[in-house]
Amino acid sequence: MRAARRGLHCAGAERPRRRGRLWDSSGVPQRQKRPGPWRTQTQEQMSRDVCIHTWPCTYYLEPKRRWVTGQLSLTSLSLRFMTDSTGEILVSFPLSSIVEIKKEASHFIFSSITILEKGHAKHWFSSLRPSRNVVFSIIEHFWRELLLSQPGAVADASVPRTRGEELTGLMAGSQKRLEDTARVLHHQGQQLDSVMRGLDKMESDLEVADRLLTELESPAWWPFSSKLWKTPPETKPREDVSMTSCEPFGKEGILIKIPAVISHRTESHVKPGRLTVLVSGLEIHDSSSLLMHRFEREDVDDIKVHSPYEISIRQRFIGKPDMAYRLISAKMPEVIPILEVQFSKKMELLEDALVLRSARTSSPAEKSCSVWHAASGLMGRTLHREPPAGDQEGTALHLQTSLPALSEADTQELTQILRRMKGLALEAESELERQDEALDGVAAAVDRATLTIDKHNRRMKRLT
């Protein structure tokens, strides 16, 4: 009977120590019945995180020396294992407590992943699906990005943040998104300028064509005929204009680069790499900085957002398989707003990513206005917190029961961030107005060029 149970859990892949000892008839370890306070606190922290991925696997239960089937779940800050039979969380710990992640073999045969925590607690995971390499690459990526994040972020992950720090972090994130949007608008303005230069060049070419057609339409005995059509005087200016028009595209216009775990068509094979967002498209590189694929902006058919940390990019083809890549990254929340600006009509938020849409239901103007008023109100309450002379006791009681006010350092930092955001918003508004005028000019130039080309076509038909 015991051998049959072992065959059910990972086909006998247990640690080779004291196999003859039987376990409790209940089959539930004593540690599981009485979880410690650290375990409960970790579960509460993880409940606030977004689940990035879940894999079926088995976990080696050290007290009973047997393997338990369940689900391994990863969030941006935590890792946990839940059993299939009872739905109970056996293991739950933050990524910041991990010391080492290794690929090992259980019983020298079965491939496993071992995770070493602070305090020398070692966890064994085996029978990982779709494969051990996929699970290892994704967990290692998020662990590494957490360690490489801002200094002190890992050490202060478990320390509760004050209201001023939370508000400062919120405003800093809003400022970064506003900077990314302003950068996209700047490159978009460069593209409009390039289009306008191309239209000016086309208009000058049409003027040359008009003179050539006039030369051809004049009779042979006309004494004022010239030989403009035999010599191309516009060769040198054309070269200069073409070089000028291609100037913005030579810089490639890199918006953002992030590390990512990349899979091509299938999820069973992944590799670490990098996603680069350009003005003209998207580039995917491997860990050796070799270009795997480049999506031109007009070639991207759809971008599906599976979660705040996972997207898939697809380009459809007729008669051959589609070109599709799936990317998982800890920095993906920074890229999704930029992709929404560039590929607004091609983005699709799936069920697990609807939290992004709910977080951005209001318009940018409403959000900036609400954030501005909220921060101004908080800073106003911080700066003016002297009680009135007539009601000292009631005000003191109110201050004791209310939330702690902002510190002077937080107030100054918030003031600087708000000032920068206001300047960025004004610059973005002026850039949008300039681009609206440029679009009107482009539309007028296109209409003039269309009329001129139609007129030249009619004149050429009369000549033939």
Curated annotation (Swiss-Prot):
Localization annotation: Endomembrane system; Cytoplasm, Perinuclear region
GO CC, alphabetical: endomembrane system; perinuclear region of cytoplasm; plasma membrane; presynapse; SNARE complex
UniProt GO MF annotations: SNAP receptor activity; syntaxin binding
Chief localisation class: membrane
Region listing for Disordered, in residue ranges: 20-42
Domain t-SNARE coiled-coil homology: 154-216, 401-463
Keyword Coiled coil: yes
GO biological process: exocytosis; synaptic vesicle fusion to presynaptic active zone membrane; synaptic vesicle priming
Keywords from the UniProt entry: Coiled coil, Cytoplasm, Membrane, Repeat
CDD domains: SNARE_SNAP47C, SNARE_SNAP47N
InterPro entries: GRAM (IPR004182), PH-like_dom_sf (IPR011993), T_SNARE_dom (IPR000727)
Record-stated family: Belongs to the SVAP1 family.
Subunit structure and binding partners: Forms a complex containing SNAP47, VAMP2 and STX1A. Associates with the BLOC-1 complex. Interacts with BLOC1S6.
Chain's role: Plays a role in intracellular membrane fusion.
Protein name as annotated: Synaptosomal-associated protein 47
Phylogenetic placement of the source organism: Eukaryota, Metazoa, Chordata, Craniata, Vertebrata
Gene name in the database record: SNAP47
